[in-house]
Structures are given as C-alpha cells and as structure tokens.
Swiss-Prot record:
Keywords: Carbon dioxide fixation, Lyase, Magnesium
Gene this protein is translated from: ppc
Protein name, as recorded: Phosphoenolpyruvate carboxylase
Lineage: Bacteria, Pseudomonadati, Pseudomonadota, Betaproteobacteria, Burkholderiales
Cofactor(s) listed: Mg(2+)
EC number(s) given by UniProt: 4.1.1.31
SUPFAM superfamilies cross-referenced by the UniProt entry: Phosphoenolpyruvate/pyruvate domain
C-alpha cells in the first residue's frame, strides 16, 4: 500500500503519499503528538520508507488473497481520495462518494479492511520511528529530549534541587497508571500480537543485512501482513470481563514487567553520584513509587458483569502471570550464574543460602549461585502453587516451603547481589538480577492494584436494605435510611461505625444487589490476605455528592471485615481508602466542601493518619464533567476544584493525591500527559499522581515496549518536575494569573456552558439527531467491551455513558466534545467583557492573548482544542447529518454546530494569530497523509449505515450480515486512524 520505487513484486498498490493537501487538516494521532513529525522533513525518510514497505506488503497480500478486481477497486478509491486531498477539487470528493455508494456484495468489507489495516500499519511505523529518533538523538550526542528523565533531572539540578531531595520525594511518591476496560477498545488481542511481530521485524531490518537476510525478513513481513489480513478483525461475541482481564495482562507480558524495572534502573543511574563501572556494585533498588493499577475485574459502576468472581479471577490471573515471569527470570539467572568456588570466593550468606536450597547434585557442588537459585526457584514455585493452586512453568527439582512475603524473596535476591558485588561478579547478570530485584519491590505477589468502584446510589440502596432488614434490632429502633436527610444519615452512619456489632446477618437472605456488594468486599478482604494489601487499596465512589456517600463505604467495609472493629488499633494499611469521584460540574464545585467535612470527622481523620499515612486520594472525572458542561466549563471546573482541594488539604496537613479520570480524547482530558501534568495548579501533584489509561490509548501507548517505556518515563519526569521545581515562584505566578484572569475564565465558562447545554440538553429533538447522525447505535452493537454503552435503555443523552458519547462524535469527525462553546465564550468576552475586565475590546483581546502565551493552564487548553479542531472535518460531518430524517431538526442542529465551529476557529486564529498547527507543519503534513485513508472509511460508514437502517426498517433486522460487520470494520479503521478518539 505504498508508492515506492522498489516494489516487492509487480503489485503497484500505493496507499501512502507525502503530499501537501489544502483545506482539511488534522491532529496528533498518537499520545506523544507524533514524535516522528516533530523533526525536520529531511529526517522523515526512514518513516516514509517503512510506511511504503508495509504498504507494498499489504498491496501484495490483497492482490493475492482477493484478486485483481478487488485490488483495483481499492486502488481506484485510494487514488480518488488522494487526488481530492491533493488539489481540493470538489468533483473528486463527489466522485469518491459516488464510487463508495456503488460498492456491493463483499466489496465494502474488503475496502474497509484494506484502509483500516493500512492505518494500523502506519501506526506501527510511526511508533517504530519514534523509537528510532530517540536512539538517533542519543547516538548523535544531542541534548536530552523534553520529557525524558535525563532532562528532568538536569533541569531540577540546575534549579538547585539535589539528589537527596529527589530521593526523599521518591520514597513517598506514587505514580500509577491505571488500566481500565472501556467500550472503545476495538482491536483484538490477536491483531495486537501480529502488530508486535511486524514492529520487531522492522527493527531487524535496520541492521546491516546480506541480500539473503533482507529477502528472508521481507518474506516474514509479508507473512505477518498476510496473517493480519487473514485474521478476523472483529469479535463475533461481546467481550467478557475475563477477556478484558487477559487483554490487559498481555501488556504486562509485552511491556510492563520488563520495562518498569528499566525505568527504575535508568533513574537510579541518573541519581548515582558516580558513573556505574563494570565491577562496582549497581545502584540499590529504588523505593517503589511507579506501580500499576487496574479497574478490570473491580469496576462495578454500571457493569452488571463485574462481581466477586471477576475480582477473584483478576487477582488470580495477575498473580499467575507475575509468578510465571518470576520463575522464568530465576531460571534464566541460574543458567547465567555459573561461577565456581574453585575460581572465585562467595559470601558466607550466599553459601548458607545455597546449602539451604536443597540441591545436592555433585555436578553443582562448586556452583553456589546456581544451587541458591535452585532453592529460590523451588520456593517461588511453592509460593505460586500455594497462591494460585497451579503448577507453573518447570517443576521444581527440590521440595521447598513457600515464601511468606515478597520481602523474603527480595532478601534472598539481595544475598546473591551482595555476594556478586563483593567478589568481582557485579557485571554478571547485572541487568537481569537488578531488574528482578526491582520487579519484586514493585509488583510484589499481586502485580497490579485492583481498584473497586461502585456508584453511590448502589451503596445507598444496600445500606437502606441492611437497615430495613435489621428492623428495630438497631439500638431498639428501626431506621428508614432513604427517608433521612443528609444530617441524619451522617449521624446514623457514624453511630454504626462506632458499634462493634454487625449490621448484616448471615441468617437473612438479602437481595441480589446487596448480597453481591457484600460479596465483592469480602472477596477484596480475602484477596488482600492472600496476595498482600497492595492487591486492593481503593474503593472509589462514583457520583459522590454528599458526605454520607463516603461514610456508607466505611460502614460496608466494617460489615465485610475490611477495617478494624471499633476499639481496636488501626494499623497502617488497614481497610480500603475511600476515594470520592467528583464527576459532574455541580459535584466538582461541591467537592472541596465535602472533603473538608470528611477530613474534619475525628474517626475519619484518625483513619487517614494511621491507616493511610496522612494521605487521601480524590478522583476527578473528565468525561462526565465534559458531557455535563462542555469542554471549557469542564476544564475550568476541574482546575478550580483542584486549587480549592489543595487549600483544604493543606489547612489540615493531609497529603492530597489526585486521581485523574482521563481518556484519550481531548474532551475526556486527553492530549499530552506530560504537558497536562506540568499545567496542573501548583501543589496538586507533590509526588502523588494516579491517572486512568483507557480504550484505544492503552494499545497506542503500551503495545510497543519502547513506546511504553517512553510514556512511563514521561509520567515520572513530569511528576518530578511538577513536584520539585521551586514552588514559590510557580505559586506566585499562578496566584497572579488567577487574580488577573479568573473573572475572564469564569465569564467564558458560564457562557460556554450555556451554549453547550443549549445545544445538547435544551434543543428539542437533539437526542434524536445524535442517535441518527452518529454511529452510536452501531457502536453499541460492536462487541468491544463488557460494559453496556448506556446506563438505561432508551435514547436519552443523560443515560448515555460519556465514553461512547465522545467516541461517537470522533467517528463522525466532529469531535464536538473538544471545542463546542469555546467560540461563543471568547467572542462574548471580547464584545462585552466580565465585571472588572479591561474596558476596550482591544485590551480584552490583549488579555486573552497574554493568557494564551503565559498561563500554562489556558495555553494547554487552547493547544488541545487546536489539535481537535485540526482533526475535525465539517464536510464529512455534513454527510452524517444527512442521516437525520427530519430536515428541520437536521438543519437546526447541524447549522448550530457549523456556526459554532466557524466561530471557534475564528476566535482561535484571533488569539494565536496563525492558522491551525502552523507552528507544527510536520505534524500537519503527517495528518494530511492519513486523511486520504480515513475519508473513504467515513464515506463508506455513512453509506452502510443508510443501508443497515433501511433494512432494519423493512424487516426489523438486517438480512445481509455483511453490512453491520462492514460498519464495524469502518469503526475499527477510523479509530485506528484517529488513535486518541475514545
């Protein structure tokens, strides 16, 4: 699928170009804003070469598998799309649409697969190019790249921050990406595995090769592309929670288990005062601060498929994968550490460990390291068998008792490391041993922390039933919990926390909902006892609106035996941290007040101090607040909430840990993670950061090990910089920005929310428009997640989940969640101003331009919006609008969207004084390449939706199953092309 002057065969299928294309523009297509196009154009040739190579392979596969007619059909569509993008002739656009409409039979599926797979292959090439560029920079001796650990450490040292201070922060820090399973992950694990193989082959092709070696690699590449083509892209059945658990675990095998210890090792070397020499001991393992979290198996909010059994399965499967890794690494160490006491000495502690290992083979009598590792392997195997009930990997050759804790395993590994260092063995197995040591401190016996999450209204109903079924057995009086006001509820819940007697009875048959909730909490208690407390640490309360929403979870924990009974000493790590999730605009505004009340309760403050180390986590929801109030109001409300929370926590000497519920799309808090962290208000990071990694973003960031390593490095570097850069100046500057610009932001936020809600919630028939003009109904039918797309049946915007809401707008190329309302807000401020604003329009414009250049929060907001606007395409969106049968509704809604889009573009140009992405021409050029391959998919999706819905109206179902499958293929391809669209 590429134009290249050295084709693999006679196939001339060309599906890539490097051409200037006017008019339609786009946005970054991966989480790193495409490192490949941040460089000068003359360094883009390796990327062009890889895309051409993969395109040729795909073209040859299509011609061989589907025949010349199908190949020619696809190539004709490609040429038409490229010609339109090159010259902007509307006639070519009409011709492209006409040719798409003529597709019949299985051709729509073949076309959708061809363009989708080309976009997948382009993503692989771009990820590989990013790795290549970073290596080239290092080889050239260039300065550290922005966002790298080296750049962060050097920057901090230049500002007077010494190593001791950095280490002190790391000893108390928490950086935790949290993988979530949301209904926007449209790629199968089978295809992701092939992607990794293709990436590996591209790496091998960069070596100096003989002609035969190159030929073999090219054949292997074609084989992998053929495998991709012959592998079913779609799932026939909806994902189960068990499937989602396995999908997530594949990223641990490919990336996290090996890459996270390397990130620690890189940081340790940067903090080491002296360069590491071959025979000097390696830096000791750092205190664990970078860990992984997961919602998969524990997130019950709106997912009836998650219960105690899925939580147990998640914990079991995580431990299984982890112990397989440990056993594999220990076995490999045994092969590497062949040192003989006939040639080198060993520490007494190492000799004792070897003697205790149980291996009495005369062939290894003089090999204490191997004998010690045989014993460690046996103990690990026994531990795995004890915790998982399975025999993993190779059977141990000697009997052994299991390890009680990860610390015991770490101690044995430390004995080996110390002996090697003391006897000229430091270079031997340095990377593997130090990596394993660090892995044990990070992953323990649990691998990742699984969060529990449930909606506050479920907790409310469960408590109401427990009180109702207890009757007057509660201190001689019945409690009608649902009838109580907030103050009475708080009083009742606090009374329950003070009583040792249980509220629930094992002799009462509770409703399915209540029984399930109690079972989940008991499963969490059992999991913590089995795998360690790190296995489950948080209980997140969705839709937190009141203080009682948090107290309810403490009472339920008491019923499940998770927290110490009243009167007993609260030990460190006791119970699960109750984490509020503030999602809507009103909840964000109430959040600081709720947290102040929470921390002021004596029993809560004692728990925070003793069990949680004076740390309290608060989660902020980006997607729901955006769906509720629109892009600007969501961002401004989040920003204000964070600042207010810092004040609340600082006044009470409690460490605040923010948990950012971000997604891939800008409307859900996406964009550059590095820039987003640095743009947080001063004091909100302070070494504490959790954030969700969701949907398509997981595979974009972590499918490739090196890309995953870079992203983790970005998170750590940004956390260090944000936490340790001199705070006084930053706080002073931020206070000045707030004092000067907060009235303008509040004015624009109110106007933007009014504009947004006026369209989405106050326009009669808007829900009908949305369900007709986007593929939301088709997305709901795609087997891409275990959780339903809507909370309730029916077509109501309020009931629709925020994630498929944003995903649908991305599919139709409007990206409405990332910009709508901004144009009206800026225009209104320029025309009328807020109270206390500069008097003249010119002065107000100067103020907004100053905000755009000097205030990180506003600058990042505009930058993210600019990327979204560049990616949107009103011409294609107009085709989706034609799916709305009511002309008046169509014209009213799409007319409002078009007007606001134009207004927002004009206001952005006015503030930035340039065209979209004019400061990043490489980025724009790369996006333009993609559009010629996304456009046909959009047009095909529109046509297929028309056919599908017409067939449903005629027969109540689609007689031709190929049509809905082809729609789903286009959804996959468009998501691959846009990447951060969930």
């Amino acid at each position: 699928m590429a134009a290249y002057n050295a084709p693999v065969s006679n196939c001339q299928f060309r599906l890539t170009h490097i051409l200037p294309i006017p008019q339609r523009q786009g946005a970054p297509t991966d989480p790193f804003q495409m490192n490949a196009i941040r460089q000068q154009s003359d360094s883009a040739e390796p990327l062009r070469h890889d895309i051409r190579l993969l395109g040729r392979c795909l073209g040859e596969v299509i011609q061989a598998c589907e025949g010349k007619r199908v190949y020619d059909t696809i190539e004709t569509l490609r040429r038409t799309a490229v010609r339109f993008r090159r010259a902007g002739d509307p006639a070519d656009d009409k011709l492209l649409q006409a040719r798409v409409k003529q597709l019949r039979g299985n051709d729509p599926n073949s076309v959708a697969r061809a363009f989708s797979y080309f976009l997948h292959l382009s993503n692989i090439a771009e990820d590989r190019d990013q790795n290549r560029r970073q290596r080239d920079r290092a080889l050239a001796g260039a300065g550290p790249e922005r966002g790298s650990l080296r750049q962060a450490i050097e920057s901090l040292k230049a500002q007077g921050v010494n190593n001791a201070r950095i280490r002190r922060l790391l000893s108390e820090a928490c950086v935790m990406p949290v993988l979530t399973a949301h209904p926007t992950e449209v790629q199968r694990k089978s295809t992701l595995d092939v992607h990794r193989e293709i990436s590996s082959l591209l790496v091998q092709r960069e070596r100096e090769l003989t002609a035969d070696e190159l030929s073999e690699l090219d054949l292997a590449l074609i084989g992998q592309v053929a495998t991709l083509w012959q592998t079913r892209m779609l799932r026939y059945t909806r994902l189960t929670v068990a499937d989602e658990i396995e999908n997530a675990l594949s990223y641990y095998r490919s990336t996290f288990l090996n890459v996270i210890p390397r990130v620690y090792g890189d940081l340790a070397r940067l903090l080491n005062r002296e360069p590491v020499k071959p025979f000097t001991p390696p830096p000791p393992p750092l205190e664990p601060f970078l860990r992984m979290g997961s919602w998969i198996g524990g997130d019950r909010d709106g997912n009836p498929n998650v219960d105690a059994a899925t939580l147990e399965r998640a914990l079991l499967r995580q431990a299984t994968v982890l112990f397989e890794h440990y056993l594999q690494e220990v076995h490999a160490l045994g092969a590497e550490l062949s040192a003989s006491t006939l040639l080198i000495e060993a520490d007494p502690a190492l000799l004792a460990l070897a003697d205790a290992g149980g291996d009495d083979s005369p062939h290894r009598r003089d090999e204490p390291y191997r004998r010690a590792l045989i014993g460690i392997y046996a103990r690990l195997a026994a531990t795995a068998r004890h915790l998982t009930g399975q025999e993993l990997a190779r059977r141990a050759t000697v009997p052994a008792a299991p390890y009680d804790t990860p610390d015991a395993l770490a101690a044995d590994l430390a004995v080996i490391a110390a002996s090697l260092s003391a006897h000229h063995g430091a270079p031997i197995a340095r990377l593997r041993l130090s990596g394993l040591q660090q892995a044990v401190t990070v992953f323990g016996f649990h691998l990742a922390t699984v969060d529990l999450r449930q909606s506050s209204d479920v907790h409310e109903r469960v408590l109401a039933e427990l009180f109702a079924r207890a009757g007057d057995g509660i201190d001689g009086q019945a409690v009608d919990y649902l009838a109580l006001d907030e103050a009475a509820r708080v009083a009742v819940l606090r009374r329950e926390l003070a009583h040792a007697r249980p509220l629930a009875s094992p002799w009462i048959a509770y409703s399915e909902e209540t029984a399930s909730e109690l079972a989940v909490l008991r499963a969490a208690a059992a999991g913590r006892a089995r795998y360690g407390r790190q296995a489950v640490l948080q209980s997140i309360v969705s839709h937190t609106e009141t203080l009682s929403d948090l107290l309810e979870v403490l009472v339920l924990q008491k019923e499940a035996g998770l927290i110490a009974p009243p009167g007993e000493t609260i030990a460190p790590g006791d119970g699960l941290m109750v984490v509020p999730l503030f999602e809507t605009i009103p909840d964000l505004q109430r959040g600081p007040e709720i947290m102040a009340a929470w921390l002021d309760l004596p029993e809560v403050r004692q728990r925070v101090r003793l069990a949680q180390g004076d740390t309290q986590e608060v989660m902020l929801g980006y997607s729901d607040s955006n769906k509720d109030g629109g892009f600007l109001t969501s961002n401004w409300s989040l920003y204000q909430a964070e600042r207010a929370l810092v004040d609340v926590f600082s006044a009470r000497s409690v460490r605040l840990r923010m948990f950012h519920g971000r997604g891939g799309s800008v409307g859900r808090g996406g964009g550059s993670s590095y820039d987003a962290i640095l743009a947080q208000p001063p004091g909100t990071v302070a070494g504490q950061l959790r954030l969700t990694e969701q949907g398509e973003v997981i595979q974009s960031k972590y499918k490739d090990a090196e890309v995953g390593r870079w992203h983790l490095e970005l998170l750590v570097a940004a956390t260090l910089e944000s936490s340790l850069a001199p705070q006084a100046a930053a706080t002073s500057a931020e206070d000045a920005h707030m004092q000067q610009h907060a009235p303008a932001m509040s004015f624009m936020s109110e106007l933007a929310q009014r504009t947004y809600r006026g369209l989405v919630y106050d326009t009669p028939g808007f829900a009908d428009y949305f369900f007709a003009a986007t593929p939301i109904s088709e997305i709901a039918g795609l087997n891409i997640g275990s959780r339903p797309a809507s909370r309730k049946k029916g077509q109501h915007i309020e009931d629709l989940r925020a994630i498929p809401w944003g995903f649908s707008w991305a599919q139709c190329r409007l990206m409405l969640t990332g910009w709508y309302g901004m144009g009206s807000a800026i225009e209104a401020y320029l025309e009328t101003g807020a109270q206390g604003a500069p008097r003249s329009r010119r002065a107000r414009l100067a103020q907004l331009r100053e905000m755009a250049s000097d205030w990180p929060a506003f600058r990042t907001l505009l930058s993210n919006m600019e990327m979204v606007l560049a990616k949107s395409d009103l011409a294609i969106a107009a085709g989706y609008a034609q799916l709305v049968p009511r002309r008046g509704l169509r014209e009213r809604v799409f007319g409002a969207i078009t007007a606001e889009h134009g207004r927002t573009l004009a206001m952005l140009r006015l503030l930035t004084r340039r065209e979209l992405l004019a400061d990043n021409p490489g980025l724009m050029a790369s996006l333009r390449e993609r559009f010629a391959y996304i456009d046909p998919l959009n047009y095909l999706q529109i046509e297929l939706i028309k056919r599908h819905r017409a067939a449903q109206r005629r027969a109540g179902d689609d007689a031709d199953i190929r049509v809905p499958r082809a729609i789903h293929l286009t959804i996959n391809g468009i998501a691959a092309g846009l990447r951060n669209s969930d």
